[in-house]
Design a protein with these regions (language model features):
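Residues that scaffold the ATP/ADP-binding catalytic core of kinase and kinase-like folds
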Residues: 23-24, 58, 67, 128-129, ...
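Alpha-helix capping/helix-boundary segments
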Residues: 19-20, 51, 124-125
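Short, flexible loop segments at the rims of nucleotide/cofactor-binding pockets, characterized by
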Residues: 21-24, 68, 93-100
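Residues at secondary-structure transition points
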Residues: 29, 46, 73, 98, ...
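Acidic, PIN/NYN-like endoribonuclease modules and their adjacent C-terminal/linker elements
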Residues: 105-108, 115-117, 123-149
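PIN-domain endoribonuclease scaffold, especially VapC-family toxins
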Residues: 37-94
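Short, well-structured N-terminal submotif of metal-dependent ribonuclease cores
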Residues: 1-47
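Active-site neighborhoods of divalent-metal-dependent phosphate/nucleic-acid chemistry enzymes
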Residues: 83-119, 124
Length: 149
């Protein structure tokens, strides 16, 4: 049976690295709906090559390697999820607002360039909610992950 939600166009979303880890490394229960949305195509996950490089680097952090090992989950499997589900975009122009954490700026820039929802738990990003809304970006902390769908 089809619902009105099924008929809606997919939502463009930018997922920061910690959200990606929640989806496929930590199996965060609060991220289940977002993971399902990505896997079923209800989310158009936008990312850049630099975001993939960051994910690959983070997957080598000792605390992440420990988690991957405990789950018998190769880092390549996480990167394969990225490659399978992401819609790769060129680097975006600088957004009108700068994040105090330079590592997060690329996520903000891409979300602003595509008027996409941005998913992050980073305090330096979350404090920019009102400014990002002025740019057409809905900022969703993990627990409200599908609120804009």
């Amino acid at each position: 049976m089809s619902t009105a939600a099924d008929a809606q166009a997919p939502v463009r979303r930018v997922l920061d690295t910690n959200i990606v880890l929640d989806l496929w490394v930590f199996d965060e229960p609060k991220a289940t709906d977002l993971r399902h949305s990505v896997e079923t195509g209800r989310t158009h996950w936008l990312a850049t090559a630099a975001m993939r490089e960051e994910l690959a680097r983070v997957l080598e952090y000792p605390q992440i390697v420990k988690r991957l090992t405990a789950r018998a989950l190769p880092a390549d499997t996480v990167l394969a999820h990225f490659d399978r589900h992401v819609q790769l975009q060129p680097d975006a122009p600088k957004a009108p607002y700068a994040c105090k954490d330079a590592d997060d700026q690329k996520f903000i820039d891409l979300a602003v360039a595509h008027s996409a929802a941005l998913h992050s738990k980073d305090a330096q990003v979350l404090c920019m909610k009102k400014r990002l809304e002025r740019c057409g970006v809905a900022l969703n902390p993990l627990m409200d992950v599908l609120e804009t769908a």
